[in-house]
């Protein structure tokens, strides 16, 4: 079996949502994605910049629907990568200001992550990678990822001066 081309990447995720306006309030209003195209009340494309869309939202088969029951197969989470720890801190401030509950926060050795749910109960991971030269490795050179508590107070100190926040981090 052949290998995938090293230039291959994931272009976008397309989510079924129950309420397009509510989903846009989260992805555009809270997380800051740019609306690139909207198709009436049934679909929208959002971008982190420089691309036609990174997230698609639609109600074609899900208008007014409920999230899948726990214990079923499907998408675990969408991971949104930020270019720096400071950018992740700003995203965390926006999430906290919107009073969106956090499900967890972790240092994985290779990255630092914050976990939450969107309004349709889809898992969302907000993260930033650590520099590759700092990734933990075993004696044989293999990655040695781990999961440790991420200090949210320390992370929030990385946000640039003047970044507003209406509430502080919750203890996890």
Language model: regions and residue ranges:
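Short beta-strand/turn micro-motifs at beta-sheet edges
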Residues: 1-2, 63-68
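Residues in well-ordered beta-strands of folded domains
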Residues: 47, 58, 79, 117, ...
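Vicinal oxygen chelate
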Residues: 1-4, 9-18, 66-172
